[in-house]
């Protein structure tokens, strides 16, 4: 009886204190001062300074404060009042935050803290933020500055090194397995980019938490609809192929058969037109062998660095600059090469922006975004390397400018971290999600179809192998992002 009476007195004291706090916070800021000389604005500022940072408090920080306040009164309660795990998961839930126009990534200032104060009292009274004994808070703390910059620099460095892989695969570019390997990596990039946008970036932009809002199954169904139509289209194309051999190809054919009978000059113009339309990539090189070019011309274009450099030096002479960058004069290099370099620099800057903002939210989010970008950059950089060679650069020049554009990712990462620390990163997640969807569906998906077009037209075992590689890449990328999303709460680094 004494225990219950003491518990009731403590609860009454807490209620009175919270009521007084509510009255103080609801008073117009700056109009009056309290008995101790501190105005309501100063009280709010002290709370934000003590429990938040940068004159604001994040939702996880506010939730931790409520858990701390609610946990302090639970030791003397009997077992009947112990909250369940479900109550703990509803502390400042997404629908509650939405009433105030907030999300999981929002930063709450003085005015916002004053407005949300009634809900804070309701959460404390209902013990929605009370944890079970020996149970840690559900919300994981934000990464430290060292973790954000350390993991960010590491991931961006690994991604940037992909730009140097192009030179190592030059001797194998005319091999059959190179084309099939490239096809798998393109499909893998589509799967990771599309799934990362569905599972993480777009939900993060809306403030959803995969552990609380249970959106993952619905996102998986969205991918299932995409994959179902892809699978059905390929099967129908294989079944109905005999009907298409008479010249009645379906309306999505991008390259009529007459183009492949043109001269080498017309073919080169077609490739350049395709590159300028944004459908460039690893498909440009494997098509060279199928389009009827002579072996000698292919060997000259895809031989070792010395062959390319010698050929260019004999035609245009050295640049007169750095010896390591010796090759054709910059004024003689095709305009397409500079367009590709500049567009790649902008592309990599946005990639870095997404990586930096993701790491400010959580280490898991940053790693997931980096994995998706890495899978996309690998085949993308290989294709860019070939484009720069075809435009007239030497291997040394192509490596240098490809790596230079890749380094723009560092600049984007820095801006992303600064924006994520001082502003809500939800807008960056929304921008990155749209970009990932476009790259996957409008850029790399047509590229994958173009790489596999020759095998599909031939039919037989070649078509089945190509179809298997496409499915393996798509499903592998989907599985990687699905596993990372489901087990995000168990991923702990550092």
Curated annotation (Swiss-Prot):
A motif (XEXPHE-motif) lies at residues 376-381. This is Metal cation symporter ZIP14. Keywords: Cell membrane, Endosome, Ion transport, Lysosome, Membrane, Signal, Transmembrane, Transmembrane helix, Transport, Zinc, Zinc transport. GO terms for cellular component: apical plasma membrane; basolateral plasma membrane; early endosome membrane; late endosome membrane; lysosomal membrane; plasma membrane. One of its GO terms (molecular function) is monoatomic cation:bicarbonate symporter activity. It comes from the Eukaryota. Its main location: membrane. Belongs to the ZIP transporter (TC 2.A.5) family. The chain crosses the membrane at residues 153-173, 182-202, 220-240, 398-418, 427-447, 463-483. It catalyses: Zn(2+)(out) + 2 hydrogencarbonate(out) = Zn(2+)(in) + 2 hydrogencarbonate(in); Mn(2+)(out) + 2 hydrogencarbonate(out) = Mn(2+)(in) + 2 hydrogencarbonate(in); Fe(2+)(out) + 2 hydrogencarbonate(out) = Fe(2+)(in) + 2 hydrogencarbonate(in); Cd(2+)(out) + 2 hydrogencarbonate(out) = Cd(2+)(in) + 2 hydrogencarbonate(in). Residues 1-34 form the signal peptide. PANTHER family: METAL CATION SYMPORTER ZIP14 (PTHR12191:SF5), SOLUTE CARRIER FAMILY 39 (PTHR12191). Disruption phenotype: Embryos with CRISPR-induced slc39a14 null mutations display altered manganese homeostasis. This is associated with manganese deposition in the brain and altered locomotor activity. Mutants survived into adulthood without any obvious morphological or developmental defects. Homotrimer. It is found in: Cell membrane; Apical cell membrane; Basolateral cell membrane; Early endosome membrane. It is a multi-pass membrane protein. A motif (HHHGHXHX-motif) lies at residues 248-255. Residues 174-181, 241-397, 448-462 are cytoplasmic. The gene is slc39a14. Coiled coil: none annotated. GO terms for biological process: cellular response to glucose stimulus; cellular response to insulin stimulus; import across plasma membrane; inorganic cation transmembrane transport; intracellular monoatomic cation homeostasis; intracellular zinc ion homeostasis; iron import into cell; iron ion transmembrane transport.
């Amino acid at each position: 009886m004494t225990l219950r009476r003491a518990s009731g007195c403590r609860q009454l004291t807490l209620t009175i204190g919270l009521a007084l706090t509510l009255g103080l916070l609801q008073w117009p800021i700056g109009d009056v001062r309290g008995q101790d000389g501190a105005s309501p604005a100063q009280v709010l500022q002290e709370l934000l300074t003590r429990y938040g940072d940068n004159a604001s408090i994040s939702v996880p920080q506010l939730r931790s404060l409520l858990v701390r306040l609610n946990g302090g009164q639970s030791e003397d309660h009997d077992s009947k009042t112990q909250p369940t795990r479900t109550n703990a998961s509803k502390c400042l839930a997404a629908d509650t935050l939405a009433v105030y126009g907030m999300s999981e990534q929002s930063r709450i200032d003085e005015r916002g803290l004053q407005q949300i104060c009634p809900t804070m009292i309701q959460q404390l009274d209902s013990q929605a933020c009370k944890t079970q004994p020996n149970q840690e808070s559900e919300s994981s703390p934000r990464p430290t500055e060292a973790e954000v910059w350390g993991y960010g620099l590491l991931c961006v460095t690994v991604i940037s090194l992909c730009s140097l892989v192009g030179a190592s695969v030059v001797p194998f570019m005319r091999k059959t397995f190179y084309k099939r390997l490239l096809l798998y990596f393109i499909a893998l990039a589509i799967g990771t980019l599309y799934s990362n946008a569905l599972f993480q970036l777009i939900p993060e932009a809306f403030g959803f938490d995969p552990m609380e809002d249970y959106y993952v199954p619905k996102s998986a169904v969205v991918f299932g609809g995409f994959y179902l139509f892809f699978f059905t289209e390929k099967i129908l194309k294989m079944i109905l192929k005999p009907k298409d051999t008479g010249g009645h190809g379906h309306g999505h054919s991008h390259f009529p058969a007459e183009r492949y009978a043109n001269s080498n000059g017309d073919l080169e113009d077609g490739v350049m037109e395709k590159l300028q339309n944004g459908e460039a990539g690893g498909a440009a090189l494997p098509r060279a062998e199928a389009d009827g070019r002579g072996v000698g011309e292919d060997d000259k274009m895809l031989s070792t660095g010395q062959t390319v450099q010698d050929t260019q030096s004999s035609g245009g002479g050295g640049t007169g600059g750095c010896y390591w960058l010796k090759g054709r004069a910059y004024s003689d290099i095709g305009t397409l090469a500079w367009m590709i370099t500049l567009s790649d620099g902008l592309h990599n800057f946005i990639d870095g922006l997404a990586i930096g903002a993701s790491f400010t939210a959580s280490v898991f989010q940053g790693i997931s975004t980096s994995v998706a970008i890495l899978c996309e950059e690998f085949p993308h950089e290989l294709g860019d390397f070939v484009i720069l060679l075809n435009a007239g650069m030497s291997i040394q020049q192509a490596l240098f400018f490809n790596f230079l554009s890749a380094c723009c990712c560092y600049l984007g990462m820095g801006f992303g971290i600064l924006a994520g620390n001082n502003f809500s990163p939800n807008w960056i997640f929304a921008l990155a999600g749209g970009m990932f969807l476009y790259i996957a569906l409008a850029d790399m998906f047509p590229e994958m179809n173009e790489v596999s077009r020759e095998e599909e037209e031939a039919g037989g075992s070649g078509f089945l192998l190509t179809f298997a590689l496409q499915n393996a890449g798509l499903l592998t990328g989907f599985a990687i992002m699905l596993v990372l999303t489901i087990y995000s709460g168990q991923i702990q680094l550092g």
